[in-house]
């Protein structure tokens, strides 16, 4: 992946929408999660058939190249996140942090045991606002489905705005020193609360309202 310039590298990873040139990316294994293996095989085949639109790579092939994963996600509009052994994948959070719309394939990924609302109710209270849930009838041609969404500029703006709002609340190493010192990140980051701030605030509100014992 090439260099997009100093402005791209100095901005928070969830910014830089103008640098995105890849429709979708999938980084993972076909065999991870026996129940979802057919879905993963289908996704990989769909990506391999349309290489100009989709980046696909084995997680093992780049497991020691974290920056490569970040670069791919930062250049992609959509990040394909089929469920594995659990509904919620780490890649979903990597995608959000990089401003890449998580593409989900099961309603369980939006709720229920292991889903967003239960595990991350304070950090991601409205996961549907920043993700795409692909209907089962469109999963065999997921890139065609996403291409239609990408052409809807208003919807894309809403998705990207939701990602920018949520991403700072998922990290702990928030660049507050940059904000205080007027560094390169100050204008974009605006010193939003980080993950710990959000958790403590949510717990305090729950205690006040009697929702947390």
Spell out what each predicted region is:
Residues 1-49, 202-203, 207-211:
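Conserved active-site segments centered on acidic
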Residues 7-11, 64, 114-121:
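Alpha-helical scaffolding within the catalytic cores
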Residues 9-19, 38-101:
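Donor nucleotide-activated moiety binding/catalytic core segment of transferases
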Residues 35-38, 142-147, 174-176:
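Short conserved micro-motifs at the rims of enzyme active sites and ligand-binding pockets
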Residues 58-59, 66-67, 146, 171, ...:
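Membrane-interface amphipathic segments in extracytoplasmic regions
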Residues 59-60, 107-109, 199:
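Short, solvent-exposed turn/loop segments enriched in Gly/Ser/Thr/Pro and often Arg
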Residues 74-171, 181-185, 189:
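Catalytic binding pocket for nucleotide-activated donors in carbohydrate/polymer assembly enzymes
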Residues 174-213:
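C-terminal alpha-helical cap of glycosyltransferases
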């Amino acid at each position: 992946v090439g260099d997009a310039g100093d402005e791209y590298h100095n901005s928070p990873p969830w910014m830089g929408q103008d640098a995105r040139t890849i429709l979708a990316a999938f980084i993972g294994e076909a065999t991870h999660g026996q129940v979802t293996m057919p879905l993963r095989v289908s996704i990989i085949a769909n990506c391999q058939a349309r290489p100009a639109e989709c980046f696909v790579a084995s997680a093992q092939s780049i497991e020691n190249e974290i920056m490569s994963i970040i670069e791919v996600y930062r250049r992609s509009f959509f990040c394909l996140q089929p469920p594995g052994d659990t509904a919620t994948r780490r890649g979903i959070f990597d995608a959000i942090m990089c401003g890449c719309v998580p593409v989900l394939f099961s309603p369980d990924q939006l709720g229920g045991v292991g889903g967003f609302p239960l595990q991350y109710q304070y950090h991601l209270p409205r996961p549907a606002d920043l993700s795409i849930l692909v209907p089962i009838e469109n999963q065999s041609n997921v890139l065609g489905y996403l291409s239609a969404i990408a052409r809807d500029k208003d919807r894309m703006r809403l998705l990207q705005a939701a990602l920018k709002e949520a991403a700072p609340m998922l990290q702990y190493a928030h660049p507050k020193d940059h904000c205080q010192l007027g560094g390169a990140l100050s204008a974009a980051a605006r010193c939003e609360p980080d993950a710990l701030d959000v958790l403590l605030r949510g717990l305090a509100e729950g205690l006040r309202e009697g929702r947390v014992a």
